[in-house]
Amino acid sequence: MDCACATGGSCSCAGSCKCENCKCTSCKKSCCSCCPSECEKCGQGCVCKGGSSEKCSCCN
């Protein structure tokens, strides 16, 4: 799964995740997809490639 983000650092994904090219600004938690833009705790401008059940743990 390719997590395309506009700007920022990198997402830290779990070993089983296929997250590539993810450049969330502040989300460093394990995740399979970028945090959606409405997540205030995570980097803005990210595109969520997964379903609602695949949100980054830092969005909870």
From Swiss-Prot:
Recorded GO CC terms: cytoplasm; nucleus
UniProt-annotated stretches for the region Alpha: 29-60
Binding sites annotated in the UniProt record for a divalent metal cation 6: C35, C39, C42, C59
UniProt-annotated binding residues for a divalent metal cation 3: C13, C17, C22, C27
Pfam family, one: Metallothio
Binding, a divalent metal cation 1: C3, C5, C19, C22
Binding site for a divalent metal cation 5: C32, C34, C35, C48
Family stated for the protein in its record: Belongs to the metallothionein superfamily. Type 1 family.
Record function comment: Metallothioneins have a high content of cysteine residues that bind various heavy metals.
Protein name in UniProt: Metallothionein
Lineage: Eukaryota, Metazoa, Chordata, Craniata, Vertebrata
Gene (UniProt): MT-A
